[in-house]
Design a protein with these regions (language model features):
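Internal hydrophobic alpha-helix adjacent to the cofactor/substrate pocket in enzyme cavities
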Residues: 8, 173-176, 319-347
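Rossmann-like NAD(P)H-binding beta-loop-alpha module
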Residues: 136-187
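FAD-binding core/adjacent interface of flavoenzyme oxidoreductases
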Residues: 74-154, 243-247, 258
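FAD-site-proximal beta/loop scaffold in flavoenzymes
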Residues: 122-148, 251-323
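A Rossmann-like FAD-binding core segment of flavoenzymes
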Residues: 20-22, 72-83, 173-286, 292, ...
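Beta1-alpha1 glycine-rich phosphate/pyrophosphate-binding loop at the start
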Residues: 1-75, 165-203, 258
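Active-site-proximal substrate-binding core of FAD-dependent oxidoreductases
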Residues: 146-148, 192, 309-314, 331-370
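C-terminal auxiliary extensions adjacent to catalytic cores
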Residues: 358-412
Length: 412
């Protein structure tokens, strides 16, 4: 996860790796995925770009551990974790191999939550991993090839959270550009954004919320707030509108359904014998240490740390995860040295920016609202902010600039 990898990077920068401690990062995948770029990867290269450009757009959103700069002395183990023995202080990976630890950082992240909806796992795609972006991209290409005025194709995105909004906005913008350039007929791709909440974009300030609605409508997206998915089949979605006993069933065409309506804590994290909150997240002390388990820390989507300014845990996001690593890494060093741990420093409010297709975005920073191109620039700068956490200066700048250059093709 974001938190685990960036914590390892902080320990390298602190000069303690191979001196004060040995650091091992365990992941089933061979690469770290930068999920805020996945929507770009999934919607990129739909305009006739070469196969090499398409491949680069998708791979740009990941970093192979074996070639990751700035992690000297860190050992990467590509194995699936099967369990954690908190008593024996061992991580069990595939093949029943045991990896002992003195300090453990649990950063297992989250996984899609299908809420028991029939047909959803089998008939919908999600956007969490690199291969998900590839599958969605290929599915869109197939629809573009088959769509016609007589047989339009329907794409339904279920879930108007940040990921769903950024994806649907970029997709709709791309479709409009293809129409303007007469690469496809106008109106042959129909895009719907559905969400169970009666109002969309509630994470934005009310004034920005209204502008975001107008922006998506201008891009041709049909907005369906208050729509709860009840079943997903091949070519359709059944849903309910309204609440309580007055639900009305509707059946919507969906040649492609993208599920972005919620995540849950990683299954392995929920299996740990530790205190959890009502959403299954690991309850932490204010030092990021797991309650009643000295030497075990957690961060990111699987962790529940109360923000003293709000009285509740912070949202599950990449931004929160890598921010937490500042104090987490320092407390790991303090723990190893036998020093008292310090409480986490958390902001009163989080900066938030959501891309809305092309060079347009919306968000807030320090209570100030931003819209349009200024917000889009700040959204791009937030990517650089993360890369500066993860990588040395020159590789961070090169990665960011290459991503900006490459994904700019999506915006014009």
């Amino acid at each position: 996860g974001f938190a685990g990898l960036v914590t390892a990077r902080h320990l390298v920068k602190a000069g303690v790796v191979e001196k004060l401690c040995d650091v091992t990062v365990i992941d089933a995948a061979a690469a770290h995925v930068y999920t805020p770029w996945l929507y770009e990867a999934a919607t990129g290269a739909l305009r006739g770009e070469t196969g090499a450009t398409k491949s680069k757009m998708i791979k740009m959103a990941s970093f192979t551990y074996a070639t990751l700069p700035g992690f000297k002395g860190v050992r990467f183990v590509q194995k699936r974790i099967e369990g954690v023995d908190l008593v024996a202080k061992q991580v069990v990976v595939e093949g029943k191999r045991l990896i002992p630890y003195d300090v453990l950082v649990v950063s297992l992240g989250a996984e899609p939550n299908y809420f028991g909806v029939p047909g959803l796992p089998e008939n919908a795609l999600v956007l969490k991993r690199l291969d998900d972006a590839q599958k969605i991209h290929d599915a869109i290409v197939r629809l573009l090839d088959k769509a016609s005025a007589r047989q339009p194709k329907y794409i339904l995105i279920a879930g108007a959270g940040p990921n769903g909004v950024e994806f649907v906005s970029e997709l709709a913008n791309t479709i409009r550009i293809l129409e303007r350039r007469e690469r496809i007929q106008s109106g042959i791709i129909k895009i719907t954004l559905a969400d169970p909440n009666p109002e969309l974009f509630t994470i934005l300030a009310p004034s920005l919320r209204k502008r975001a609605v107008r922006r998506l409508e201008k891009l041709g997206v049909e907005l369906r707030p208050g729509l709860r998915v009840a079943e997903v089949g091949q070519g359709y979605v059944k849903a309910f509108t309204g609440t309580g006993k007055h639900n009305d069933a509707v059946r919507l065409p969906a040649d492609l359904c993208i599920w972005s309506a919620g995540v849950k804590v990683n299954t392995l994290a929920t299996s740990l014998s530790v205190l959890k909150d009502d959403r299954g997240r690991i309850v932490l002390e204010n030092s990021y240490m797991v309650a009643s388990h000295p030497g075990v820390f957690a961060a990111g989507d699987c962790a529940s740390l109360i923000n003293p300014h709000t009285g509740k845990p912070d949202p599950q996001s990449a931004q929160v995860a890598h921010y937490q690593t500042h104090d987490l890494s320092k407390n790991i060093i303090r723990y190893i040295k036998g020093q008292p741990l310090k409480a986490a420093h958390l902001p009163k409010r989080w900066a938030f920016f959501s891309a809305l297709g092309g060079a347009c975005a919306a968000g807030t920073l320090g209570g100030v609202k931003f819209w349009g191109y200024p917000a889009f620039l700040l959204r791009r700068i937030s990517d650089l902010y993360y890369f500066l956490y993860l990588l040395p200066l020159v590789p961070a700048l090169k990665t960011w600039l290459e991503g900006v250059r490459l994904y700019h093709k999506n915006d014009c």
